[in-house]
């Protein structure tokens, strides 16, 4: 098996970002809790608690401490998590911004005061991905402050004079000129209904910040492209202020040609494949690595430069790629499947199975515009009849209320609203 094993301590800091609302393709009628042979004949009953389960995008964990929920990750012998390497991606985003500053420092400093000021849109203060990205940016820019052994990821509110105890001023030297780097403002983008990662809230925030700071804002940074594009369209584009996001959504990648500074691809094409592939393998009764690190009967296989597997936490992680003006044209369509794993499985050897899959928030831009379209392409290739359930981004009950008949499905793919809430789902499967 081609896989790199990481320590549990590293995995605890990781999480993920994916699909959204929609409907599955046609296929067989729900097969209930029966296990079928390759010829389609039913054999033995499978209890819901023993059916394959994959968590994706939100890794079961304590949202305050980041400690992984191992009970959820090991719910049964066919339970896995699929996401991306949050720390590697966070570091990559920070490095991308620093590289941009080094190449454009003089023009970035809009008012010529020697201070490169940035504002930061924080997605969700309790989400591991959001925490990692905030820390990655602050670490790279030198604005991070240590708190209990890690960089403080708390939003600063406003920090016009650099006196905040949450962040500090950083510095960078470019062509013999020294610049101060200051986080002028940051806030969690949560709307009045409680939904986080909210693009509309980010659009309102940049208007407020622009009114307060004016040409002190030299860079806009966001934990994701949904919020980043909202700020870019509302203010940054017109004022020619580089904006950096995360997710490589198609609209953000296209906007690089219009001044969007850059984004990070979390290899959603690999993540979406892994999300359904681990279920396919469990349903086929083959090794979980089949079609992943080991070539399958159709020729599908991934190389270890695009993913790794952490056996201790039963977690698959896709690796990230920086998308900038130099390479953005390669990423313009984020819904194209990954070519090495785009071969159709034989329907006789891999008969159709029924999967219940939810997306935590139907309004999430990344999950809706990138991840779900990829899932819908892979479900055809893997002979899976997937029912897609779209949540409201606020409560688990909006989703779990639609899992009233788990016996109608052969496997489950779950994207929680909050990482703490795995038991809301496993409790249903245990009934």
Where are these regions (language model features)?
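A residue-level marker of the well-folded mature domains of exported/periplasmic proteins
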Residues: 26-431
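C-terminal motif of bacterial Sec signal peptides marking the signal peptidase cleavage site
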Residues: 17-20
């Amino acid at each position: 098996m081609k896989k790199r094993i990481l320590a549990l301590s590293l995995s605890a800091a990781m999480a993920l970002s994916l699909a959204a609302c929609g409907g599955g393709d046609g296929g067989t009628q729900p097969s209930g809790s029966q296990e079928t042979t390759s010829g389609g004949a039913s054999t033995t009953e499978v209890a819901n608690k023993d059916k394959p389960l994959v968590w994706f995008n939100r890794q079961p964990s304590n949202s305050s401490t980041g400690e992984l929920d191992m009970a959820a990750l090991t719910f049964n012998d066919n339970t896995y998590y699929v996401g991306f390497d949050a720390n590697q991606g966070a570091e990559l985003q920070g490095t991308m911004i620093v590289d941009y500053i080094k190449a454009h420092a003089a023009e970035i400093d809009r008012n010529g005061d020697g201070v490169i000021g940035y504002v930061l849109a924080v997605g969700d203060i309790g989400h591991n991905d959001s925490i990692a990205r905030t820390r990655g940016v602050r670490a790279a820019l030198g604005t991070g402050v240590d708190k209990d052994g890690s960089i403080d990821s708390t939003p600063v509110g406003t920090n016009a004079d650099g006196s905040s105890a949450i962040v500090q001023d950083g510095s960078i030297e470019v062509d013999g000129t020294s610049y101060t780097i200051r986080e002028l403002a940051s806030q969690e983008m949560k709307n009045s209904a409680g939904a986080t990662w909210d693009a509309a809230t980010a659009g309102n925030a940049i208007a407020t910040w622009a009114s307060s700071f004016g040409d002190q804002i030299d860079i806009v940074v966001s934990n994701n492209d949904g919020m980043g594009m909202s700020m870019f369209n509302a203010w940054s584009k017109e004022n020619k202020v580089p904006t950096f996001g995360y997710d490589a959504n198609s609209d953000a990648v296209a906007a690089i040609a219009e001044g969007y500074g850059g984004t990070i691809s979390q290899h959603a094409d690999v993540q979406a494949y892994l999300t359904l592939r681990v279920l396919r393998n469990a349903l086929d009764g083959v090794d979980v690595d089949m079609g992943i690190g080991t070539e399958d009967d159709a020729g599908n296989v991934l190389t270890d430069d695009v993913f790794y597997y952490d056996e201790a936490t039963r977690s698959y992680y896709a690796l990230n790629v920086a998308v900038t003006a130099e390479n953005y044209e390669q990423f313009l369509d984020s819904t194209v499947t990954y070519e090495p794993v785009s071969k159709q499985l034989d329907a006789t050897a891999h008969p159709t199975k029924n999967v219940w899959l939810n997306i935590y928030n139907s309004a999430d831009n990344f999950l809706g515009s990138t991840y779900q379209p990829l899932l819908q392409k892979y479900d055809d290739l893997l002979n899976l009849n997937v029912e897609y359930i779209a949540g409201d981004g606020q409560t688990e009950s909006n989703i779990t209320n639609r899992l009233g008949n788990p016996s109608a499905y052969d496997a489950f793919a779950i994207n929680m609203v909050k990482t703490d809430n795995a038991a809301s789902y496993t409790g249903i499967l245990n009934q």
